[in-house]
């Protein structure tokens, strides 16, 4: 089945984006205070469903896009948009989220704590890829955590696709699945050539998984499956291709209820709550 990519005919034409050496997309889906300074570019995800809502920046329904897949692909619709619509003059591309950014907490205002263009310029001299710190699951593996939180068939289908179409990535995948740490959040900054390669590989894998996986009975949260799976693929791609990276801290615009989050984690592991 051919994958659908659409071009939004209803959006007004935009002037060519003013591109610096770096563009970091800020994925958002509702009105929120956003950074409107270089190198940050707010992008409204799932915009095809909200023709009357414009949040500033760009929309993932413009140009070549998969905006209609946002309920299942989450912020990856922004990633796809960037791969196919950002001019190649953007020599590095990143992805963040309206509630989380790379930065160091120094003030009471998170948007003042995010890294500046000059910070990123220095980071990219040090490494072609910048990531957040790894998540450590401590009491279970990356695979068991996913299975307790979502559906086993997601991982099994992904494993089958890698085995059949990208077998060179299977050793790194199995090593990651049996380990307890991985980079999640779908946050990174990459040199453009690596960004293009990663996106092409990632969507080739996920589109094939989508063809094979029946999610018709999934809850709204579990239906975000391809966004969740992508978080378990970034390290697989990096490790297989021996690509170096550095890690930088994350600042949040909203507080996390760690007690609730931790309780849910334990209950899922015990099979009491999905």
Residue ranges and their predicted role:
Residues 17-274:
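ER/Golgi luminal nucleotide-sugar-dependent glycosyltransferases, focusing on the catalytic module
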């Amino acid at each position: 089945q051919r994958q659908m990519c659409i071009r939004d005919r209803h959006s007004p034409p935009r002037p060519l984006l003013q591109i610096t050496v770096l563009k970091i997309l800020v994925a958002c889906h509702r009105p929120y205070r956003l950074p409107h300074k270089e190198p940050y570019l707010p992008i409204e995800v799932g915009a095809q469903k909200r023709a009357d809502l414009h949040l500033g920046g760009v929309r993932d329904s413009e140009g070549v896009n998969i905006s209609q897949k946002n309920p299942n692909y989450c912020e990856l619709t922004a990633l796809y948009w960037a791969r196919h619509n950002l001019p190649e003059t953007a020599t590095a591309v990143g992805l963040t989220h309206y509630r989380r950014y790379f930065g160091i907490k120094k003030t009471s205002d998170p948007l003042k704590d995010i890294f500046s263009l000059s910070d990123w310029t220095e980071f990219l001299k040090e490494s072609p890829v910048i990531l957040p710190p790894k998540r450590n699951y401590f009491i279970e593996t990356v695979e068991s955590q996913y299975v307790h939180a979502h559906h086993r068939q997601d991982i099994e289908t992904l494993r089958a696709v890698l085995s059949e179409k990208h077998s060179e990535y299977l050793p790194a995948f199995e090593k990651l699945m049996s380990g307890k740490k991985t980079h999640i959040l779908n946050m990174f900054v990459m040199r453009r050539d690596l960004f293009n390669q990663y996106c092409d590989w990632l969507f080739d894998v996920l589109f094939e998984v989508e063809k094979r996986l029946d999610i018709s009975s999934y809850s709204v949260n579990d239906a975000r499956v391809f966004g969740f799976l992508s978080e378990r693929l970034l390290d697989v791609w990096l490790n297989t291709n021996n690509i170096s990276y550095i890690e930088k801290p994350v600042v949040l615009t909203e507080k996390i209820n760690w007690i609730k989050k931790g309780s849910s984690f334990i209950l899922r592991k015990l099979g009491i709550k999905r």
